[in-house]
A protein has these predicted regions:
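Short acidic/polar hinge/loop motifs at secondary-structure boundaries
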Residues: 109-136
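Repeated loop/turn-to-beta-strand initiation elements of outer-membrane beta-barrel proteins
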Residues: 162, 188-191, 241-245, 280-288, ...
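N-terminal periplasmic "start-of-domain" segments of outer-membrane beta-barrel proteins
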Residues: 30-63, 91, 99
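Extracytoplasmic beta-strand/coil segments of soluble accessory domains associated
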Residues: 69, 73-109, 130
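Outer-membrane beta-barrel signature, preferentially recognizing the C-terminal barrel domain
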Residues: 263-279, 309-314, 380-381, 395, ...
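Periplasmic-side early beta-strands and strand-to-turn transitions of outer-membrane beta-barrels
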Residues: 140-141, 153, 161-172, 176, ...
Length: 612
């Protein structure tokens, strides 16, 4: 019998456009919300065995966050540390892992810097996003390196349909932003275009000065500005024989100011991709995707050039989904990418290649479901690495499901780790091995009509952590870490009310030193509550975290905090809406990174329009 992926029209349609068309949040009674990141195939959230959080365009317009990190903060398993608001350096921790141990995809393409190993989500305009899927737990058996804590996939392409959207926002810190978007269909051709811009005078993120590497303090009593402009365009065409092909591009560029030396960064974040896919037979779907991501930062000190780091990653992926007898969906494919680095820093190597083969079998046994995955990567820097994953789910009742899984993962050393030139105080180590991890977890999902409860308990053991070895003035694989955690979520929906609560509890330990891992709060909670009253909507968000340490030695502590936001929306007419929101209503002083102040009380007003 064919797998449900091929029998269900909406799943197959989404698969034909994977990963771009999957940006649409399909939410009807029959299928529920469709996700693709957990298995690289389209499935409903109800059918997904992995812990998944989906944030749609409707969520973004309801919350109106100023940035992607602000949208992600406090979601199940996520901890955000930032050097202030408005484009300042931000670290996203998923399940207690570091920012470099979380894989970020943009429209199916690997994003981020090959030198730092992280993705600058603070530079990605939230106005360009249609959907975010957060998959928690290792996914190296599907995606390869860096998916220790999980995968965050950001989709920028709108779903089906035609129309215009526009919005303008103004508020505190001299902040203005605007967005205009259109999408449509001409015959079998779809297109979309979104432009956005944001400008903020900002605030002084380090009122007491910025410490330098020379032990001094740089005091710059000025506001730290931010500018960002972005463009996203795409087109796709569907042939009568079922084959679909298309291309799209996203580019964001701007500048951010801060205190210190250097004190300004000009940036470019760019993702370009093209794809072709379709059903070769009734039981065989194939897709080829090629793309390039770019991460460029030009650092300036008082207006003079200081350093440049430009990463370009060309990638290709060929994926095949085969429906097998016995309710099985077999996915096999090839992935490959090449990292190139162009920098004012003289790295000993400026490129490396990675090739991989992967396979996954999804088996539906009625009450029981089983997913088995295996992948082998061959990287010219550190050789071959094999990862695997096994997940089992069982329906205890019609609305109650239990899951258990075990998976392995690894993080590739960065160009800074491997190839940084010897400058006396530091040099890269070309003999590094990847960091490796083993994760086990159990979960429970209870779906009771309007209420959905999710609980997951996990343990992640990480070996060969790459840390600075002062005795050798380089980095080495010398540390081990253990992360135990519990994450829970409760959602309620009705015609008039929407409520969501998330709580994450972490116990982290560097098993070499006995210290807690830095910038990981033991408890993180987020509560959202919205009331719909005809043409009006009222809402509030409470984000709370307890204290944490800022450094690996656990000598600098950060206090816990609670931040309360309020929002109200008035539907002026079917096409027009007015929204006001107040962030940090109680004007709390708090930091998520030592010496860097988070913004105080702030207010914003948004006027939006959409065609009916």
């Amino acid at each position: 019998m064919d797998h449900p992926f091929f029998r269900h029209p909406s799943l197959l349609a989404c698969g034909l456009l994977l990963p771009l068309c999957s940006a649409q949040a399909q939410t009807d009674e029959e299928t529920g919300t469709i996700v693709v990141t957990a298995t690289r195939t389209a499935q409903t959230v109800d059918d997904t065995l992995a812990p998944v959080t989906v944030l749609t365009r409707a969520d973004i317009e309801r919350l109106r966050p100023t940035s992607v990190p602000d949208l992600l903060a406090g979601q199940p398993g996520i901890d955000v540390s930032s050097n202030g608001a408005f484009g300042k350096n931000t670290s996203i921790s998923l399940r207690g892992t570091s920012a470099g141990q979380t894989l970020v995809l943009i429209d199916g393409i690997r994003a981020g810097s090959a030198t730092s190993g992280t993705t600058a989500l603070e530079y990605l305009p939230v106005d360009q996003i249609e959907r975010i899927e957060i998959v928690r737990g290792p996914r190296a058996s599907l995606y390869g390196a860096d998916a220790l804590g999980g995968v965050i996939q950001i989709f920028t392409r709108p779903g089906t349909g035609s129309g215009w959207q526009a919005s303008v926002t103004g508020g505190s810190f001299g902040t203005w932003s605007g967005r205009a978007a259109t999408r449509g269909e001409i015959g079998n051709t779809r297109y979309h275009l979104t432009v956005s811009g944001l400008a903020s005078d900002g605030y002084d993120i380090q009122e007491n000065g910025a410490p330098t590497s020379f032990g001094a303090t740089t005091v710059e009593p000025d506001d730290d500005r931010y500018r960002n402009t972005a463009l996203n365009f795409g087109v796709s065409h569907h042939l009568d024989n079922g084959v679909e092909f298309g291309a799209q591009a996203l580019r964001a560029e701007g500048r951010t100011d801060y205190d210190g030396f250097p004190n300004r960064t000009d940036f470019v974040e760019q993702v370009i991709s093209a794809h072709v896919g379709g059903e070769l037979t009734e039981t065989w779907y194939s897709r080829l995707t090629v793309g390039e991501s770019r991460d460029e930062t030009d650092n300036l000190a008082n207006g003079s050039d200081f350093s440049t780091f430009d990463t370009r990653r060309q990638s290709a992926s060929w994926q095949n989904d085969l429906s097998l007898p016995g309710e099985q969906l077999l996915t096999v494919g090839l992935d490959g990418w090449r990292d190139r680095v162009d920098s004012t820093t003289d790295f000993s190597e400026d490129r490396r290649d990675n090739w991989a083969v992967f396979a996954q079998d999804q088996i539906d046994l009625g009450r029981h479901q089983l997913i088995l995955g295996l992948r082998r990567d061959d990287n010219e820097a550190f050789g071959t690495h094999t990862t695997g994953n096994a997940t089992w789910g069982v329906a205890l009742r019609e609305n109650l499901r239990a899951t258990a899984s075990f998976g392995t993962a690894f993080k590739a050393p960065t160009f800074n780790d491997l190839y940084y030139p010897d400058e006396g105080f530091y040099a890269g180590n070309p003999d590094l091995d990847p960091e490796t991890a083993q994760n086990m977890e159990v979960g429970l999902q209870y779906d009771l009509a309007q209420f959905i409860l999710n609980v997951n308990v996990f343990r992640n053991d990480i070996d060969d952590l790459i840390v600075f070895d002062a005795a050798k003035s380089t980095v080495s694989n010398i540390d081990q870490a253990r992360i135990d955690g519990v994450e829970s979520g409760l959602t309620y929906r009705s015609e008039e009310w929407r409520a969501h609560a998330a709580l994450t509890a972490l116990d982290t330990e560097n098993r070499t030193t006995g210290a807690e891992l830095p910038r990981r709060a033991e408890l993180t909670g987020r509560i959202e509550l919205d009331r719909i009253m005809g043409a009006y909507r009222l809402g509030t968000t409470l984000l709370a975290q307890d204290g944490r340490y800022d450094d690996a030695a656990n000598t600098v502590s950060l206090a816990g905090y609670g931040r309360l936001d309020l929002r109200a929306e008035w539907l002026l007419m079917p096409q027009w809406a007015l929204q006001v929101r107040i962030e940090n209503v109680l004007d709390k002083d708090y930091q998520t990174a030592a010496t860097y102040e988070q913004p105080g009380r702030a207010g914003y007003l948004t006027l939006s329009y959409r065609t009916p």
